[in-house]
């Protein structure tokens, strides 16, 4: 969906970690966010990572900001593209699948 965000609209995309599935980003979420959103326009990335979900689920972002600042990656960190050579080899997360092949375990 990220690849097609200009067609379907970034306001219609929500990022998810797929936890607890094996293709999820657990342990490598910052890297997965960087792989997906690094180098993308900040307004689009923020919408797909944060504000779309907050609006859909009714989250109070002002109330959550102190927690996010404590445990989450910063917008500046997410904005840094992750070179495929840096993709974690220990992860089975689809974000690091350069072939975009669906896996079956």
Model segments located where?
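Active-site flanking residues adjacent to catalytic metal/cofactor-binding acidic residues
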Residues: 17
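Mid-to-C-terminal alpha-helical segments outside catalytic/metal-binding sites
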Residues: 1-12, 20-105
């Amino acid at each position: 969906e990220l690849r097609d965000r200009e067609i379907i609209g970034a306001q219609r995309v929500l990022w998810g970690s797929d936890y607890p599935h094996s293709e999820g980003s657990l342990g490598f979420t910052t890297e997965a966010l960087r792989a997906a959103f690094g180098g993308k326009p900040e307004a689009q990335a923020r919408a797909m990572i944060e504000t779309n979900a907050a609006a859909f689920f009714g989250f109070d972002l002002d109330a959550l900001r102190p927690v996010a600042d404590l445990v989450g990656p910063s917008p500046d960190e997410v904005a840094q593209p992750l070179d495929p050579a840096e993709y974690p080899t220990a992860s089975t997360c689809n974000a690091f699948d350069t072939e975009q092949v669906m896996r079956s375990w």
